[in-house]
Amino acid sequence: MNKRRNLLNISDLTVDDVENITKLANQYLKKEVANSHILENKTVINLFFEDSTRTLASFEIAAKSLGANVVTLPIRSSSINKGEDLKDMIKTLNAMNPDYIIIRHKSSGIINTLAKYVNCSLINAGDGSSEHPTQALADYLVISNHKKQIKDLKVVICGDILHSRVARSNIRLLKMFGAEINLVAPPTLICKHFPEVDSVHYSLIEGIKDADVIMLLRLQKERMNNSSSEKEYFYLYGLDSQKLSYAKPDAIVMHPGPINRGIEISSDVADCVILQQVEFGLAIRKAVLHYYRPC
């Protein structure tokens, strides 16, 4: 069991933490965990202020399968809509003595602020364009199951880098293990403030040459003021089988979802390891709840 309470950012993790969590996740995938009800009599509260299918469902399934009592608060009918401050809402929920609060919110960095007001384990399920640590852990697990080692792998992250919490968490996590990180995006969607990044490209074909791993990102129009046409974007940055031929023959294509077929990826390359990312995401969230369980 980890002595630290919260998983807010990749910087909260050590190499040992990542290896222990992924080891647990592999055990859950293989159904090798001895105590499947390790969270019996524990309470998990899910607070999702942004839409979610994969992350919310997998946290719910993970917690219930481990024996926890799960409360997913419907935000649209919560006291937030009566004008309650988020800080006061968190303090109120904390007073009910849950064991975990899992939060997704549109504001970057807000979860780090809220951590000051809770006594339980706080897990970041995505905060604005800041971080999404459990998605990065799931992606790390997928890559580790397909490649012998992360060190020196050429990983290309392509798409809306500017608004992507998945990109930020993956860059930080994969760099911990020595991956070579390359970004591909239009100039308006790139973020150059990553000291961990090895190269930045504005051409997809140039960027994915000899790539081992290609991670595609959704255009996050909900976080944009304006954007290029979808047809133009796909022509320049959408991945299809012809563009994929520039990568290594055994390259894996990843996408955190939801997929927009015909925008960032064509149907002929969409069904690779993307569903495995979902499957492994569930195992990772079981492992995270297990690893951060209260005494």
Swiss-Prot record:
Keywords: Pyrimidine biosynthesis, Transferase. Disulfide bonds: none annotated. Pfam families: OTCace, OTCace_N. Carbamoyl phosphate binds at residues 54-55, 104, 132, 135, 257-258. It is an enzyme of class 2 (transferase). It catalyses: carbamoyl phosphate + L-aspartate = N-carbamoyl-L-aspartate + phosphate + H(+). GO terms for cellular component: cytosol. L-aspartate binds at residues 82, 165, 218. GO terms for molecular function: amino acid binding; aspartate carbamoyltransferase activity. Pathway: Pyrimidine metabolism; UMP biosynthesis via de novo pathway; (S)-dihydroorotate from bicarbonate: step 2/3. Catalyzes the condensation of carbamoyl phosphate and aspartate to form carbamoyl aspartate and inorganic phosphate, the committed step in the de novo pyrimidine nucleotide biosynthesis pathway. HAMAP family: Asp_carb_tr. Belongs to the aspartate/ornithine carbamoyltransferase superfamily. ATCase family. This is Aspartate carbamoyltransferase catalytic subunit. It comes from Wolbachia sp. subsp. Drosophila simulans (strain wRi).
